[in-house]
């Protein structure tokens, strides 16, 4: 490709509304342009990267035995009503009616459509297992699209759905998809972790997220510094302290604390170690409970894990925190003065709290706290559960090493759905025993457009994008200095351009009448891995300058050797 016949569209300045580095660089490198909120046009450079990501995904899905299909973006509402998600999904589901007043949606996902297809096409266990996939546009009406294509309303996604007659069969396909995803992200040159995850609104049993490590990530991911243990922070287990609870050394004392309504204020005003404080959070109880509220206690420096808390048998789902009015109606004290002593509602404490002694907590009286509280002496030990977020340095739950926490960008997610959708849509086949059998499902997604942004978040420097070789828009940039004035520069550039293309190498030759500084800046901004610079001065010695984008290393290569050098560098 020649720049004179190409839409380069690079920008010198960073657009003001671009918050994260991937959004900034995708705009500056001429990869995307905004059409409306959360909607983007992919320009040639961006589309080349997107297609490379898509091709790697497709190759590995095919290698794993999945079958490609293509389903409509527009879906009839009756399928969503049949599955129960018409009411559940919320405003992210873009709904509309056609000219016949029939309701439809723009598909944010395709569980209903694929299950409808399978229930009409499959009849026997002999046809299973099957795993269908597509790479197709999705639409979610995000309340606040942001970060460019990282959280857009329209995006390209690979979604796959597998169907089985046994949990064992589902597990085999799930393991195959886990391995395929690992190969996909490894081939793309990404630093990622596969982490245990919550199944969320999609439902089901086992679930893993594939997270690309990046400072701009929206998720906290947890992994051991020694073993393969990794989990989303929502699921990472905080194991109980290994040391026994220390003996009491203080008497419980009622202390006036009129200006201490938060843990931070209590610690500052009374010079308490925060590790000796407990905070009490009140949430709604399940409907058939004798009490309307449940008290959850975590150490002062720890955070409640809402996903873990919501799964407790006494706690209502979705997790709902009590209002001050609701708290006062039950406790007769405000939220800044709550604690376990004389608490009239069920109490659940975190494992770390259960190991505490001589601690401070609210007295359930406005403006007062108890100091020196000890379990079993001052208050009976309540139900103990893991209800906090882990912190860096906690022991790994597998007993190997300690936990690290980093930010991650979710680029893939795999689920064992079980029978949630097949039961709702009555998708069954005749089993081996001749009886009807409801199908067991798995689903497996990759955000193809999000992968492009995540790769940039992990691969950039002050000059622009530093693409991993496998997904770079071009493999080689040829920069002929003053080629419109120097015949030998032009002749060699054209010769190398033809020879490299004949080797199957993707080349961008900058044949613009531009200053060298502009040419260098654009190629580095775009992030092409290999650059060769052809100039009269080096040609006097039969040399060409070669530069590797990732390391910045430069070297002089003889003109007769440069093609073989590049072929070896690119193809190995």
Swiss-Prot record:
Q: PROSITE patterns this protein is in? A: AA_TRNA_LIGASE_II
Q: Which UniProt keywords apply?
A: Aminoacyl-tRNA synthetase, ATP-binding, Cytoplasm, Ligase, Nucleotide-binding, Protein biosynthesis
Q: Please give the Gene3D superfamilies that the UniProt record associates with this protein.
A: Anticodon-binding domain, Bira Bifunctional Protein, Domain 2, YbaK/aminoacyl-tRNA synthetase-associated domain
- Predominantly, its location class is cytoplasm
Highest taxon of source:
Bacteria
Q: What class of enzyme is it?
A: ligase
The family database entries (CDD domains) matched by this protein are listed as:
ProRS-INS, ProRS_anticodon_short, ProRS_core_prok
Kindly indicate whether the keyword Repeat belongs to this entry: no
What reactions does this protein catalyze?
A: tRNA(Pro) + L-proline + ATP = L-prolyl-tRNA(Pro) + AMP + diphosphate
Please give the Gene Ontology molecular function terms for this protein: aminoacyl-tRNA deacylase activity; ATP binding; proline-tRNA ligase activity
Give GO cellular component annotations, separated by semicolons.
cytosol
Q: State if Kinase is listed as a keyword.
A: no
Where it sits in the cell: the answer is: Cytoplasm
> Might you give the EC number(s) for this enzyme?
6.1.1.15
What processes does the entry annotate via GO biological process terms?
prolyl-tRNA aminoacylation
Task: State the InterPro entries in the record.
Answer: aa-tRNA-synt_IIb, aa-tRNA-synth_II, aa-tRNA-synth_II/BPL/LPL, Anticodon-bd, Anticodon-bd_dom_sf, Pro-tRNA-ligase_IIa, Pro-tRNA-synth_IIa_bac-type, Pro-tRNA-Synthase_IIa_type1
What the entry says about domains is:
Consists of three domains: the N-terminal catalytic domain, the editing domain and the C-terminal anticodon-binding domain.
Q: Which family does it belong to?
A: Belongs to the class-II aminoacyl-tRNA synthetase family. ProS type 1 subfamily.
Give a short account of what the protein does.
Answer: Catalyzes the attachment of proline to tRNA(Pro) in a two-step reaction: proline is first activated by ATP to form Pro-AMP and then transferred to the acceptor end of tRNA(Pro). As ProRS can inadvertently accommodate and process non-cognate amino acids such as alanine and cysteine, to avoid such errors it has two additional distinct editing activities against alanine. One activity is designated as 'pretransfer' editing and involves the tRNA(Pro)-independent hydrolysis of activated Ala-AMP.
Report quaternary structure and partners. Homodimer.
User: What is the protein name for this chain?
Assistant: Proline--tRNA ligase
Q: Which organism is it from?
A: Salmonella typhimurium (strain LT2 / SGSC1412 / ATCC 700720)
């Amino acid at each position: 490709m020649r720049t004179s016949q190409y839409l380069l569209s690079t920008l010198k300045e960073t657009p003001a509304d671009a918050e994260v580095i991937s959004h900034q660089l995708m705009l500056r490198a001429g990869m995307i342009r905004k059409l409306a909120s959360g909607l983007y046009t992919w320009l040639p450079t961006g589309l080349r990267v997107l297609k490379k990501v898509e091709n790697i995904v497709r190759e590995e899905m095919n290698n794993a035995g999945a079958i490609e299909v293509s389903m409509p973006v527009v879906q009839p509402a009756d399928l969503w009503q049949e599955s129960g998600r018409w009411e559940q999904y919320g405003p992210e589901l873009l709904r509309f009616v056609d000219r016949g007043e029939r309701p439809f949606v723009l598909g944010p996902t395709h569980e209903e459509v694929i299950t409808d297809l399978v229930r009409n096409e499959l009849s026997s266990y002999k046809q299973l297992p099957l795993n269908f996939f597509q790479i197709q546009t999705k639409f979610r009406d995000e309340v606040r699209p942001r970060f460019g294509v990282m959280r857009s309303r329209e995006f390209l996604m690979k979604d796959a759905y597998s169907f089985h007659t046994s949990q064992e069969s589902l597990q085999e396909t799930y393991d195959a998809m886990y391995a395929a995803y690992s190969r996909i992200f490894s081939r793309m040159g990404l630093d990622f972790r596969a982490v245990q995850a919550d199944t969320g609104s999609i439902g089901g049993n086992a679930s893993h997220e594939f997270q690309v490590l990046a400072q701009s990530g929206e998720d906290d991911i947890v992994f051991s510094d020694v073993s393969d243990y990794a989990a989303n922070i929502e699921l990472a287990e905080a194991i109980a302290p290994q040391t026994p609870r220390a003996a009491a050394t203080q008497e419980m004392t009622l202390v006036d604390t009129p200006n201490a309504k938060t843990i931070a204020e209590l610690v500052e005003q009374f010079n308490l170690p925060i590790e000796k404080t407990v905070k009490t959070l009140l949430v709604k109880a399940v409907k058939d409970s004798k009490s309307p509220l449940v008290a959850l206690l975590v150490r002062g420096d720890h955070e409640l894990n809402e996903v873990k808390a919501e799964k407790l048998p006494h706690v209502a789902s979705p997790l709902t925190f009590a209002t001050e009015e609701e708290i006062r109606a039950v406790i007769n004290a405000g939220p800044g003065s709550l604690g376990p002593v004389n608490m009239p509602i069920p109490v659940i404490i975190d494992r770390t709290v259960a190991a505490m002694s001589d601690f401070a907590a609210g007295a359930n009286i406005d403006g007062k706290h108890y100091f020196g509280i000890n379990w079993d002496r001052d208050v009976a030990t309540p139900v103990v559960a893991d209800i906090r977020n882990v912190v860096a340095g906690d022991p790994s739950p597998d007993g190997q090493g300690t936990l690290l926490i980093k930010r991650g960008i979710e680029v893939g997610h795999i689920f064992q759905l079980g029978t949630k959708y097949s039961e709702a849509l009555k998708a069954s086949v005749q089993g081996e025993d001749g009886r009807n059998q409801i199908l067991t499902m798995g689903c497996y997604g990759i955000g193809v457009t999000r992968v492009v942004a995540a790769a940039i978040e992990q691969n950039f420097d002050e000059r622009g994008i530093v693409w991993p070789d496998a997904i770079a828009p071009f493999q080689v940039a040829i920069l002929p200095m003053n080629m419109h004035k120097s015949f030998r520069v032009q002749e060699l550039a054209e010769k190398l351009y033809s020879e490299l293309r004949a080797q199957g190498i993707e080349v961008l030759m900058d044949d613009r009448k531009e200053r060298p500084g502009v040419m260098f800046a654009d190629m580095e901004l775009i992030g092409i891995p290999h650059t060769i610079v052809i100039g009269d001065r080096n040609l006097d010695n039969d040399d060409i300058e070669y530069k590797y984008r990732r390391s910045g290393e430069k070297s002089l290569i003889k003109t007769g050797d440069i093609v073989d050098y590049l072929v070896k560098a690119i193809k190995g």
